[in-house]
Design a protein with these regions (language model features):
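Sec/Tat signal peptide C-region and signal peptidase I cleavage site
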Residues: 27-31
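Bacterial N-terminal signal peptides that target proteins for export
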Residues: 3-16
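Short beta-strand edge/turn micro-motifs at domain boundaries
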Residues: 150-179
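Surface-exposed, charged secondary-structure patches
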Residues: 108-151
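Early exported N-terminus immediately downstream of N-terminal targeting peptides
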Residues: 33-112
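Generic structural "secondary-structure junction" signal
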Residues: 75, 89, 119, 174, ...
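Bacterial N-terminal signal peptides
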Residues: 14-24
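Solvent-exposed loop/turn segments at secondary-structure junctions
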Residues: 87, 104-105, 143-144, 172-177
């Protein structure tokens, strides 16, 4: 009986150690993806600040804005989300025209705001896993001129296993840019 109890304890300890190792290993992967999301946002912000500091408003800035969209966003997913049910009912031709027009508007808006970006700085606050497929990266945008108050910004990052992270939405002071 004593020998049987000892075997049960040993088996239980092995199970607990295996579970603990499993939690540590998955916790590490979890932390890596949240860290990866935070680094992605910091890289994006640094890239925008570099462009804003060095580029005059010219045709090159439109290409750089377009490149940023390609690197950090899943453009077609975002574009389709902005018009909701109309996307599902649109023909292929209508979708392609919308994608082209929407992209032109987004690139134009981004390119025209680079001068304003020169006076902004981003300060990382936190990154956290939300649900199964989302990471939220929070930070503060500070206007160095003092013209505007600091604003809380949250980046909603899509985290699908086996795929690259990408920005799905951006909220300022809890107001979603995608939903407004």
């Amino acid at each position: 009986m004593h020998r049987h109890l000892h075997k049960c304890r040993v088996a239980l300890m092995r199970i607990l150690v295996a579970l603990a190792l499993g939690f540590m290993l998955t916790g590490g992967a979890y932390a890596d993806r949240t860290d990866e999301a935070a680094k992605m946002i910091e890289t994006l912000v640094a890239e925008i600040q570099d462009i804003a500091a060095t580029v005059a408003i010219d045709d090159n800035i439109y290409k750089q804005s377009d490149d940023i969209i390609d690197r950090y966003f899943k453009y077609e997913t975002l574009a389709s989300f902005t018009i909701g049910p109309y996307w599902r009912n649109a023909s292929d031709d209508q979708r392609q025209r919308y994608l082209k027009t929407f992209r032109a508007v987004v690139v134009e808006l981004a390119a025209n705001n680079f001068e304003y970006f020169r006076s902004l700085e981003y300060m990382f606050q936190s990154s956290e896993k939300k649900g199964k497929n989302w990471i939220i990266v929070n930070g503060i945008v500070h206007d160095k001129t003092g013209k505007y108050p600091d604003a809380m910004v949250s980046w909603r990052i899509k985290d699908t296993p086996g795929q690259d992270l990408y920005i799905f939405d951006l909220s300022f002071e809890n107001v979603s840019m995608l939903l407004t």
